[in-house]
Amino acid sequence: MMWENWTIVSEFVLVSFSALSTELQALLFLLFLTIYLVTLMGNVLIILVTIADSALQSPMYFFLRNLSFLEIGFNLVIVPKMLGTLIIQDTTISFLGCATQMYFFFFFGAAECCLLATMAYDRYVAICDPLHYPVIMGHISCAQLAAASWFSGFSVATVQTTWIFSFPFCGPNRVNHFFCDSPPVIALVCADTSVFELEALTATVLFILFPFLLILGSYVRILSTIFRMPSAEGKHQAFSTCSAHLLVVSLFYSTAILTYFRPQSSASSESKKLLSLSSTVVTPMLNPIIYSSRNKEVKAALKRLIHRTLGSQKL
């Protein structure tokens, strides 16, 4: 066979941003480190305030808390290794390390897609069927919906990662990305991957496009209900409860669809890296900022938390 004399790959090299100058990489390190810390602090703050404040115990904030946990996980999987490639040129990653990173990328990504759809359903019930909302979105139902979102991430991550790393890697080991995403890793496989690529497309449609269509359908019904409300105040109040989620969904899915539904030949590897940066680094930072700035209840809860903290320090 043509691969008999090739060396079996035991580690990979992340190309990351090695084409840039050392000075520019240092600037990117400072930028991404700042974004990373802001992301962690912002999402931890959302988690704390939705747990501690009695006014934020509704299903909407339960799901928001789950979203913040997912965003923290997403960042921990991708950003620390990327920072290492920028500041100390630590571009190598073991075979197991690459598989682990890819597994959790799939896990958090699929779980977030499903959770965003669940959050849209919560807003749909709250606005379109408010009388039955307490029954439909009870504690047990919310826990089941959240668990289903997390479990969806487990299933797709297990199937995809196990399949990819069962292929032989016996040639080049340079992954043209800043993390172990599936397309650049699959490009290094020395076997026929056509069946896997068909399955991967099916999984992408199922876990990205299908939840997006559910969200779209929910918001069509929500907007239709809002426009039929008689009072301007009622319209404003109803829309304000879902505007933050709608903005988060727009950011998340615009980059996801551009990244995974464009033909492989239509975009350069550098533009794909920029899109991936937007979805894996920038969006997780913006989510807590969006919710804390556009949601009146979250803003009020943050003010109460700050006042309590400052008051306890004075004592």
From Swiss-Prot:
Membrane-side (Extracellular) residue stretches: 1-26, 77-100, 162-198, 260-272
Keyword annotations: Cell membrane, Disulfide bond, G-protein coupled receptor, Glycoprotein, Membrane, Olfaction, Receptor, Sensory transduction, Transducer, Transmembrane, Transmembrane helix
Keyword Transmembrane part of the UniProt annotation: yes
Record: glycosylation sites: N5
Disulfide bridge partners, by residue number: C98-C190
Cytoplasmic side: 48-55, 122-140, 219-238, 294-315
Tissue specificity as recorded in UniProt: Expressed in the tongue.
Membrane topology type: Multi-pass membrane protein
GO molecular function: G protein-coupled receptor activity; olfactory receptor activity
GO biological process, one term: detection of chemical stimulus involved in sensory perception of smell
Compartments where located: Cell membrane
Coiled coil, from the record: none
Gene3D superfamilies, A to Z: Rhodopsin 7-helix transmembrane proteins
GO cellular component term, pick one: plasma membrane
Listed Pfam families: 7tm_4 (PF13853)
Segments traversing the membrane: 27-47, 56-76, 101-121, 141-161, 199-218, 239-259, 273-293
Role played: Odorant receptor (Potential). May be involved in taste perception.
Family note: Belongs to the G-protein coupled receptor 1 family.
Designated name of the protein: Olfactory receptor 10A4
Organism (species): Homo sapiens (Human)
